[in-house]
Swiss-Prot record:
One of its GO terms (molecular function) is proton-transporting ATP synthase activity, rotational mechanism. Belongs to the ATPase delta chain family. GO terms for cellular component: plasma membrane; proton-transporting ATP synthase complex. This is ATP synthase subunit delta. It is a peripheral membrane protein. F(1)F(0) ATP synthase produces ATP from ADP in the presence of a proton or sodium gradient. F-type ATPases consist of two structural domains, F(1) containing the extramembraneous catalytic core and F(0) containing the membrane proton channel, linked together by a central stalk and a peripheral stalk. During catalysis, ATP synthesis in the catalytic domain of F(1) is coupled via a rotary mechanism of the central stalk subunits to proton translocation. This protein is part of the stalk that links CF(0) to CF(1). It either transmits conformational changes from CF(0) to CF(1) or is implicated in proton conduction. PANTHER family: ATP SYNTHASE DELTA CHAIN (PTHR11910).
Length: 189
C-alpha cells in the first residue's frame, strides 16, 4: 500500500477528526485499533483498497459500510469523507497523527531508555514516577541495552534527552580536566 507521509493536509484531517470526536475519543481510538487489526492480521486489503486510486468510489463506500457496525458512526462518516475526497492513501497517516493528538490531549508519553543492562520493573516504575510531573502519564517504556554507557541511563522523551550515564559523566570530567590543564599551563607562561 502506498502511504502518504506527513504534511499539512494530513494534520488538518487529523485535527478535524479530533475536534469532531473530543467527547468520545475512546470510541474513536477503539475503531482505529479495529481498523489497524484488520491490517495487522495479514489482511491489509482494507486500507490498501481505500488507498487504491483505480478502485471505484461506490465499491469503496460499500467496503466502508461493511465495518460500520464495528466502529463509531463519527469515524465511519469521517472515513467516507476522506475517501470521497480522494485522500484514502492518507488514512494511515491521518490515524497516526490523530492518535498523537489524543496522547497529547491525555498527557501520555512514550519514552526510550538506554541503559547498560536491562531495567527491572521497579527501575522502570521509578523512572515513570520521576517523569510524571514534567511529562504526564508514561504509556510505554522502550528499554535498549548498550553496555558502552558503563552505568546509569539515557532517557529520550520526544526531543528531550536526559543523559545520566557514567560514560557521559566521564566525558564531562575529561573535558573539565583538559580545561584545567590548559588554564594551569597558560597561567605559568
Amino acid at each position: 500500500m502506498t502511504q502518504y507521509r506527513g504534511g499539512y493536509v494530513t494534520s488538518c484531517y487529523a485535527q478535524a477528526l479530533f475536534n469532531a470526536s473530543v467527547s468520545k475519543l475512546n470510541d474513536i481510538c477503539k475503531g482505529i485499533k479495529f481498523i489497524f487489526n484488520l491490517s495487522e492480521n495479514g489482511n491489509n486489503q482494507f486500507l490498501s483498497f481505500l488507498a487504491n486510486p483505480t478502485a471505484n468510489l461506490k465499491d469503496k463506500i460499500s467496503v466502508i459500510e461493511l465495518i460500520t457496525n464495528h466502529i463509531d458512526t463519527t469515524l465511519s462518516r469521517f472515513i467516507l469523507v476522506v475517501v470521497t475526497n480522494n485522500r484514502g492513501n492518507m488514512l494511515l497517516q491521518i490515524f497516526n497523527t490523530f492518535l498523537e493528538y489524543v496522547r497529547k490531549h491525555n498527557k501520555e508519553v512514550s519514552i526510550s531508555v538506554t541503559s547498560c543492562s536491562k531495567l527491572t520493573t521497579q527501575e522502570k516504575q521509578g523512572i515513570c514516577n520521576a517523569l510524571l510531573e514534567k511529562y504526564g502519564k508514561v504509556v510505554s517504556i522502550t528499554n535498549t541495552v548498550d553496555p558502552s554507557i558503563l552505568g546509569g541511563f539515557i532517557i529520550r522523551v520526544g526531543f528531550d534527552i536526559i543523559d545520566v550515564s557514567l560514560n557521559s559523566y566521564l566525558q564531562s570530567l575529561q573535558e573539565l580536566s583538559k580545561i584545567a590543564v590548559r588554564s594551569m599551563v597558560n597561567s605559568k607562561v
